[in-house]
Amino acid sequence: MTDSVQTPDVPLLDAVQARLLGCLVEKEATTPDTYPLTVNAAQSAANQKTAREPVMNIDAGSVQHALRQLEALGLARQHFSSRADRYEHRLQAALDLTRQQTVLLALLLLRGPQTLGELITRSERLHRFADTDEARHAIERLQQRALLVVLPRASGQREDRYMHLLCGEVDGAALAARYASSGGGSSDAADPGLAERVAQLEAAVAELQAQLAELRG
């Protein structure tokens, strides 16, 4: 990649499309044996109750429709098979991203505004950053390309939080205030490491349940 800040045309996504795109990136790394994902597996991933903000309840028809829309936008690709159609993401190729940038965007698609520390901790199963500078550089490149934004700090927040712009411009002040009032953010918790490990274990259980559902289906 060059130092140019030009970005390929970026289609705006709705909330369901954004969730599913993030899931495809995540599951490529965490469940490679069942990737690309079937519609059922994508639905299970999208509706996980851990590592998701907000928690959603998307029906199978809406999942299939959103996946087809992502394919039409060039952000996903369908694989046909005799048993079930499967989908893979094309986020990295479509937007000419590095792996690091792709992972950061996926986390923001799945979990909303996060600090640099949260992004680094939560990315470990997808990409292990060499150090904080590597992650910060990837964030700066995404900012230059207008793919994410730094949110203004709400009262009591000690760190900057970042949000993707794949669903369009955001009201940074309102989003930051809502995030603060909800008590979100592991960096402000008493034991952020423990909270994140619990979330990872719960996500692993959800992935196993999704794989079992796929085998039964």
UniProtKB/Swiss-Prot annotation:
Species classification: Bacteria, Pseudomonadati, Pseudomonadota, Gammaproteobacteria, Lysobacterales
| Species annotation | Stenotrophomonas maltophilia (strain K279a)
A Pfam family cross-referenced in the UniProt record is: DUF480
Query: Which InterPro entries does the UniProt record give?
Result: DUF480 (IPR007432), WH-like_DNA-bd_sf (IPR036388), WH_DNA-bd_sf (IPR036390)
SUPFAM superfamilies assigned to the protein according to its UniProt record, in alphabetical order? Winged helix' DNA-binding domain
The name of this protein is: UPF0502 protein Smlt0097
Task: State the similarity comment.
Answer: Belongs to the UPF0502 family.
Looking at the record's lineage, which domain of life comes first?
Bacteria
